[in-house]
């Protein structure tokens, strides 16, 4: 078994726990492998549109994975900091090898119960299914990659499209759960005594909620454009080019902001620790 395949198999053996499924690079690699598995052996001339659809969907899944995983890591980091401030866990615990997000969530559940804070209770209630949805999504991707590599067989086109649609639905469902969570976080920020959970609010602010909403809309736009006729596609490209000039400055600002956020995220010591384990 190759060095690349070993972490995938280990992930399944370990129950694909939280510290594994937040590895953005591993998920992206799995999606690239799946794209190759699902498109190999297909007729590029007769099935050009269908193959393009598969590639577009996989690319959308990769973008969504980075977005949700990044928000997830920053959100859980802020919860950890909140627990440190409340004296529920020590700063030294972060250096222990057995530290994981499960411990953070476990302590957070007990902390909010002790505080008897209704807003934190509802937040924790929405947090669990959001995290679980991302866990299930990446678990499915990893398992599909292992099966595809082990079998080594080519998929017929209809099966490939069906498998990709399943992954898209997983990410779509996960995005909606994070949207619901993000809206709840906004209510936390509006509380009178918000000092104790201000970090949680800032880590999942309105900008992140808007990004998820935009990502969901982006999928629909991409698929609509793919289904247009050649004539309509040419018209859409012209309109897109015109609007891109108008939004160029805004896009550069957004791109710069994302780059800084992700650079900060990837360099985070806790994230590096989880990815190495």
Curated annotation (Swiss-Prot):
Keywords: Cytoplasm, Nucleus. Residues 234-243 have a biased composition (Polar residues). The keyword rRNA-binding does not apply. Residues 232-262 are annotated as: Disordered. It comes from the Eukaryota. Coiled coil: none annotated. It is found in: Cytoplasm; Nucleus. Its main location: cytoplasm. GO terms for cellular component: cytoplasm; cytosol; nucleus. This is Uncharacterized protein C21D10.08c. It comes from Schizosaccharomyces pombe (strain 972 / ATCC 24843) (Fission yeast).
């Amino acid at each position: 078994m190759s060095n690349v395949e070993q972490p995938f198999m280990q992930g399944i053996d370990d129950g694909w726990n939280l510290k594994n499924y937040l590895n953005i690079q591993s998920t992206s690699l799995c999606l690239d492998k799946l794209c190759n598995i699902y498109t190999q052996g297909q007729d590029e001339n007769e099935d050009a549109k269908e193959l393009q659809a598969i590639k577009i969907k996989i690319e959308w899944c990769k973008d969504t994975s980075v977005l949700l995983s990044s928000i997830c890591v920053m959100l859980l980091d802020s919860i950890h900091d909140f627990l440190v401030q409340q004296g529920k866990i020590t700063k030294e615990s972060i250096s222990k090898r057995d530290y994981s997000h499960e411990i953070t969530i476990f302590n957070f559940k007990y902390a909010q119960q002790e505080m008897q804070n209704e807003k934190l209770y509802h937040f924790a209630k929405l947090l669990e299914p959001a995290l679980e949805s991302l866990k299930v999504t990446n678990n499915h991707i990893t398992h599909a990659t292992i099966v595809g590599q082990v079998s080594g067989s080519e998929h017929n086109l209809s099966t490939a499209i069906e498998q990709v649609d399943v992954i898209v639905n997983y990410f779509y469902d996960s995005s909606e759960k994070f949207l619901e969570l993000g809206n709840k976080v906004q209510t936390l920020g509006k509380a009178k005594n918000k000092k104790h959970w201000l970090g949680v609010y800032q880590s999942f602010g309105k900008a992140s909620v808007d990004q998820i909403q935009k990502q969901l809309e982006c999928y629909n736009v991409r698929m609509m454009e793919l289904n247009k006729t050649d004539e309509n596609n040419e018209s859409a490209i012209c309109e897109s080019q015109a609007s891109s000039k108008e939004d160029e400055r805004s896009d550069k600002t957004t791109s710069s902001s994302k780059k800084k956020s992700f650079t900060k995220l990837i360099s985070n010591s806790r994230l590096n620790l989880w990815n190495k384990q």
